[in-house]
A protein has these predicted regions:
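Catalytic core of DAGKc-family lipid kinases
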Residues: 14, 43, 54, 93-163
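ATP/NTP phosphate-donor binding region
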Residues: 1-78, 85, 89-90
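Short glycine-rich loop/turn motifs that provide flexible caps or phosphate-binding loops at active sites
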Residues: 21, 78-81, 105, 150-152
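Short amphipathic alpha-helical surface micro-motifs
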Residues: 31-35, 83-84, 120-122, 129-131
Length: 163
C-alpha cells in the first residue's frame, strides 16, 4: 500500500453518515458533514462525490456491499466506532476495499482519536486532501472485525454506557 494517494484522481467518492451516531444533536452533525462535503468539492471533482445517510446498522450491509461492487475509490465515514466497524466488517468480506477515512461524529470515536483525526471539517479535509495513508491492522473475533480493541463482560457494559 502506498504512503500517499492522489485523491484528485478518485472517480467515486462517498460520504456515509449515520444520523443516529453518538449522543449529539443530529442537526449539529449534519451541519459538520455538509461542511466536509463543501470543502471536499474544492479538492475533488464534485461529480464524483455522493453523500448517503444511514439510520441503522441494518442499512450498512447493503450499502457497504454496493460500495465494493461498484468499486468506489474512497469512503468517508461520518459516525462513531460502531458505524465504522460495521462498514469495515462488510468491506473485509469483499475483494475490492476502498480507501476509508473517518470523520468523528459518534460518542467516543476511539479509532479517529488513535488516527489523530479532527472533528473540525476544515482540519479533516485538509488532512485527507494530502492523501496520506495510515494502514490499520484489522482484528477478528467470533467472525466479526474489530479495529481497536475487543471486550467482553464488564468491559462491554462500560462501553455501552459511555456518555
Amino acid at each position: 500500500m502506498p504512503n500517499r494517494v492522489d485523491i484528485a484522481a478518485f472517480q467515486k467518492v462517498m460520504i456515509v453518515y449515520n444520523r443516529n451516531s453518538g449522543k449529539q444533536l443530529f442537526a449539529s452533525m449534519l451541519a459538520r458533514v455538509n461542511e466536509v462535503k463543501k470543502r471536499l468539492k474544492q479538492v475533488i471533482d464534485p461529480k464524483s462525490l455522493e453523500i448517503v445517510e444511514i439510520k441503522s446498522f441494518e442499512q450498512v450491509e447493503g450499502l457497504a456491499a454496493r460500495i465494493c461492487q461498484e468499486k468506489y475509490d474512497w469512503i468517508i465515514v461520518a459516525g462513531g466506532d460502531g458505524t465504522l466497524r460495521a462498514i469495515i466488517d462488510v468491506f473485509a468480506k469483499h475483494e475490492h476495499m476502498p480507501y476509508v477515512s473517518v470523520f468523528p461524529a459518534g460518542t467516543v470515536n476511539l479509532v479517529a482519536k488513535e488516527l489523530l483525526m479532527s472533528n473540525d471539517p476544515a482540519k479533516c479535509v485538509k488532512r485527507v486532501s494530502k492523501g496520506i495513508v495510515s494502514p490499520v491492522q484489522l482484528g477478528k473475533a467470533n467472525g466479526h472485525i474489530f479495529l481497536t480493541v475487543a471486550g467482553i463482560g464488564f468491559d462491554s457494559l462500560v462501553v455501552d454506557n459511555v456518555s
